[in-house]
Curated annotation (Swiss-Prot):
This is Threonine--tRNA ligase. InterPro entries: aa-tRNA-synt_IIb (IPR002314), aa-tRNA-synth_II (IPR006195), aa-tRNA-synth_II/BPL/LPL (IPR045864), Anticodon-bd (IPR004154), Anticodon-bd_dom_sf (IPR036621), Beta-grasp_dom_sf (IPR012675), TGS (IPR004095), TGS-like (IPR012676). The lineage of its organism: Bacteria, Pseudomonadati, Pseudomonadota, Betaproteobacteria, Burkholderiales. Its cofactor is Zn(2+). Its EC number is 6.1.1.3. It is found in: Cytoplasm. Its main location: cytoplasm. HAMAP family: Thr_tRNA_synth. It comes from Burkholderia mallei (strain ATCC 23344). Belongs to the class-II aminoacyl-tRNA synthetase family. Coiled coil: none annotated. Homodimer. It catalyses: tRNA(Thr) + L-threonine + ATP = L-threonyl-tRNA(Thr) + AMP + diphosphate + H(+).
Amino acid sequence: MVSIRLPDGSVRQYEHPVTVAEVAASIGPGLAKAALGGKLDGELVDTSALIDRDASLAIVTDKDADGLDIIRHSTAHLLAYAVKELHPDAQVTIGPVIDNGFYYDFSYHRPFTPEDLEAIEKRMQELAKRDEPVTRRVVSRDEAVSYFRSIGEKYKAEIIESIPASDEIKLYSHGSFTDLCRGPHVPSTGKLKVFKLMKVAGAYWRGDSKNEQLQRIYGTAWTRKEDQDAYLHMLEEAEKRDHRKLGKQLDLFHIQEEAPGMVFWHPKGWTLWQQVEQYMRRRLDAAGYLEIKTPMIMDRSLWEASGHWQNYRENMFTTESEKRDYAIKPMNCPGHVQVFKHGLRSYRDLPLRYAEFGSCHRNEASGALHGLMRVRGFVQDDAHIFCTEDQINSEAIAFNKLAMSVYEDFGFDRIDIKLSLRPEQRMGSDETWDHAEEGLRNALKACGLEWEELPGEGAFYGPKIEYHIKDALGRSWQCGTLQLDMMLPERLGAEYVAEDNSRRRPVMLHRAIVGSMERFLGILIEHHAGAMPVWLAPAHAVVLNIAESQAEYARTVAQSLQKQGLRVSADLRNEKISYKIREHTLEKVPYLLVVGDKEREAQTVAVRARGGVDLGVMPVEAFVERLREDIQAFK
């Protein structure tokens, strides 16, 4: 007798072992038809999986997130099936699920063209309509290697050869195509109805640039056409908002081959940067942080003591001088500990909050670089709080409030918070971890925030809170972090004198709100589609004269506004006013001030707001008042 407990708490009993599909059918024909897989004691399995013991089971359908993953995984295999039918000499490698879709890497003697993708997608649709059953068989490693070598799939054979000989290998087949996979997969190809191939890109075999370059075909798959249409529309909007495109259009920054992953900031872009940095500096100062500056290059010995040299060296830029090894800092924390250690610290000094707009460099792979979002040289709004265990809760509460307020000011009102808890391998006692985790939980609770807990995802030296902001397109970006660290103060010898005159290690809280300034500015540009809130905009307004006779008045107006601390310039070029208006509209300047003879005589300006809104003619002082109200509204 086999007892199956269902999600609603009910228990069904079967005289013999049953498959997931049979359990679904016993519940109802609708569920049997909708079943894509099962969750057996928490593990995803195929509908063909045999249950021969008492267990809990949830039937997975296309209404479940797991169901969508199964569909995407199966569609990746459908892609490989179609490619092999159309291009038999193509070699298949790997094809995982990724955010919003999947990809599959192929080795082929020529590049796939857009026409190839169109033909492959058409063949995928034909294969799906055949509704061929997807079957699974388990074989030994040697049997699997032999099979794939016999059909000329050397990459698959190489993957399997790296698997321990004692492991069982799962092979999935539909029609004439067989692939290596851990599964699960849909029961038949007819379940795959909504998908689209997106693009082809290069990828190295096993991610190593020394290996052969493969062709990676990306695709997306969904349960409903409406969802796919919405996703494709979002991609269109994302392309319009691409910070690389807007960075060029708005003359904010550029990146060039001589400095890969490093940003050249132009005057307008640097003005935008400064608005963000100065805003953050004001907020940190008000919250009791002390700003410091630490060296960019430090001796190898410090990085060995911190553990970075042993564990992070491949991502560090290093140099040598006078027979000493140095590293350009990839992070600021070891330097902040040095400042803390300089002098005797008392418990009365704690909490001590050090902040730095620290310039860091990391040797990211060239293929991973992406505009401002993934760079090699970046600045963080980094800070480290040195405190006692009893102060963790109050410091976390203060940080949560500060972070939420900052995100709101920048226009982000949807924040997902994740709390990563202790892993199996960790330092510190269970009591210390209990205290630390509960301190972070209570801090989130005290701020009225909701969060998701991730057991086992914390670092071995402490739990962590992550702050994921959602932009105007619903995309999630991890920016803020509050990481509790019980290790680095010990490794680097940080201590303070406790109330009983004993020497104790402080707890170290690593924290950032915007994270990488470069990345955050990229997010801001895309979130606002380049039309920055007035307080952030590189230019508040531009004064435009209609004819040469108003040039002096236009210049005077601009200078008057500049003296009042406003970011205003005058465009006095001998161009048609319509041309100048169009140009500055494309630059997304919040206000255009047009002056003709009437405005000069009346000492007024004709005001056009961003979006082509005509605000009419008004005295310069009235415009200044309006502009200041706009700036304060966003602050």
